[in-house]
Amino acid sequence: MAAAGALTILAAGAPEATDASMPMLEVMGRRVWRYGSTAAAASLAKISVNYLIAHALQALAESITLLERGGLDTGQFVEMINDSVFPGPVYGGYGEAIARRAYTPPGFTTVLGLKDVMLAVDAADDAGARLPCAPVLREVFETAVSQVGADLDWAAVAEVTRGRSRLSWW
């Protein structure tokens, strides 16, 4: 993605250093987002993005499981949401993976997803913030790592919800 200039870059650091890095960053990324003077700020933003994706994966898992239990075409559903309310790589790409149960090769593994959920929990604790859905996400990701596959794409967390709805993929 860097060679294609398609990365989303979160930059942080001393303004002079960030300014000096901008020409290189702009070549690698389609957009550079500045997050202040500390690397911790950019890290927190990245953790928050991945925490949001974890929520999206679980929402997709639940919606697709509901459709499967109702006998509907999940591929058409994913195409519809990607064309209307949720265009983009998260709902479109991961939605398709979940609908097709295509979790290899992984772009980001379930074990890395669990790590990022826990990083969000730790960051929230440090900031005094509450993440009410975090215990559910943690449990789903822990189950995915131990019972579905630690090295599968993190979209495979959908199989936890499917399994609990008696739609096993094994």
Enumerate the predicted regions with their spans.
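Rossmann-fold dinucleotide-binding core
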Residues: 1-51
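Hydrophobic alpha-helical segments
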Residues: 19, 165-170
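Secondary-structure boundary/capping signal
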Residues: 29-32, 131, 169
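Helical "substrate-binding/catalytic lid" subdomain
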Residues: 41-164
